[in-house]
Each structure stands twice: as structure tokens, then as C-alpha cells.
């Protein structure tokens, strides 16, 4: 049996979560499909040109987010480290992304912030849509991250994928354009 590559694992995981996460976001946005208790009701209302929704999903998510008191992360017992982290939090713009990061967690169960130094070795950090990212953990030690992946559709429909390892990045580009 052929060894499954990290690229194959990433593509499979990212493909698998798209439909489910899109559905969760539609529910949050109030676009839930109408569900009937019987076929008869479905037949009676099939020609109805109206939309009825009661979006309790958004109420639950928003009430949790509204009650959260978001703070800059800190390092317990390390004031200098906490000050540096606070500075990075501000400089990278994560302070402006806090709500979206937590909203992702509340809707999908996960959120991603990708941090990496730029060409000038200055740390950059960005919130990324959970539908576009995957974290793969070691099967024997679930606290150890093996790699992370992000894919996105670039200009012209080309799909790009980056695998993030602790010591390197691997870049992949599709040979042809794909329809999103």
C-alpha cells in the first residue's frame, strides 16, 4: 500500500471540511433549509414563494461573543515576554481580528492564525478562514503539531496550497484553474 503524503492528507482534510463549514456558516447567517415534519407539509408548502427563518444559531453564537472579554494574551510569570507579546499583538493587527477569530471558533469549532516572519524577519500574523486551513497532529502525541496547511484560490482560478512545518514551508500551485 502506498504511503499517503502530507500533501494528500491536507487536500483530503481541506476538501472534507468545506461543505460542512459552509453549511455551519449558512446556518449562522440565517440560511437554514426549511424542514417539515411530514411529506404532506412539504407538498402543501412546496409552491410557497416566501422564506421563514428563526435564526437561533446566531443568537447563541453572538451572545457568547458579546459576553466574552477579549484580552491580549499573556505569559504567566514573564512580564517582559507578555509586554513583547502585547506589542506583537498590536503591530500585527491581531487586536483587530480578535472578534473574527473567536467567531470562527464559535461557528466551526476552530480558528487559525498563521504567524511567520516576512522577508525582513519581521513577524507577521493573520487570521485565516477555518475553511481554508487544516492542522494535522501526530497520531501518537496529539499535542504535537506535525504540520498545518492552507489553500486558497488565487487570481485566474489557480489553487495555491502551503504546508507549514516547524522548520520550513512547502508551496504548491495547481497546473490549471478550478471553479470555486
Q: Which residues are covered by each model-predicted region?
A:
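Structured, contiguous alpha/beta core segments that scaffold functional sites
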Residues: 103-180
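Extended, helix-rich architectural segments
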Residues: 1-126, 142-144, 155
Amino acid at each position: 500500500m502506498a504511503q499517503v503524503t502530507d500533501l494528500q492528507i491536507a487536500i483530503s482534510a481541506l476538501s472534507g471540511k468545506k461543505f460542512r463549514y459552509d453549511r455551519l456558516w449558512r446556518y449562522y447567517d440565517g440560511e437554514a433549509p426549511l424542514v417539515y415534519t411530514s411529506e404532506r407539509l412539504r407538498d402543501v408548502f412546496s409552491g410557497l414563494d416566501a422564506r421563514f427563518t428563526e435564526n437561533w444559531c446566531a443568537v447563541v453564537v453572538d451572545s457568547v461573543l458579546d459576553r466574552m472579554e477579549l484580552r491580549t494574551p499573556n505569559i504567566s510569570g514573564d512580564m517582559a515576554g507578555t509586554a513583547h507579546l502585547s506589542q506583537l499583538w498590536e503591530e500585527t493587527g491581531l487586536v483587530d481580528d480578535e472578534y473574527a477569530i473567536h467567531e470562527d471558533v464559535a461557528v466551526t469549532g476552530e480558528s487559525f492564525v498563521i504567524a511567520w516572519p516576512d522577508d525582513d524577519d519581521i513577524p507577521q500574523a493573520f487570521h485565516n478562514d477555518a475553511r481554508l486551513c487544516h492542522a494535522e497532529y501526530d497520531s501518537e502525541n496529539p499535542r504535537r503539531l506535525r504540520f498545518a496547511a492552507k489553500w486558497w484560490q488565487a487570481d485566474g482560478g489557480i489553487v495555491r496550497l502551503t504546508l507549514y512545518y516547524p522548520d520550513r514551508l512547502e508551496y504548491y500551485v495547481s497546473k490549471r484553474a478550478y471553479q470555486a
